Amino acid sequence: MADKALYVVGQKRFVQTMRKAGADMQELKEVNRRAADIAKPEAVARAPRGKTGRLAGSIRAGATQKAGIIRAGRKTVPYAGPINYGWPARNIRPGTFVNDAVASTESQWAKEYETFVKKTMNQIKGA
């Protein structure tokens, strides 16, 4: 429950299209990492802080060929998921700090994808 990801709508189709266009999928993984790295500081800033600040300290960026990922929590911070997404049975309201951070930085990380798409399209013969 501690590792959560926010996926962009249409990301799967985007990856399929880029693969068909001959895009370097390792390069797409790097673009995904840069996008996650852009949103990470905002997620850290928005994370609720208690006495220790362990939740904010557990936030990290990652990437696959399919998505950039911001993870919060680990074994020593198992409450990250309930704090971000809520837990109705325990009367914990969602804080959505990771989701809000990704949404608020969209204009910045979207430029990374735009640059990647333009570069890939320029490499396609006849485009």
Locate each region found by the language model.
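Short, Lys/Arg-rich flexible segments
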Residues: 1-77, 81-127
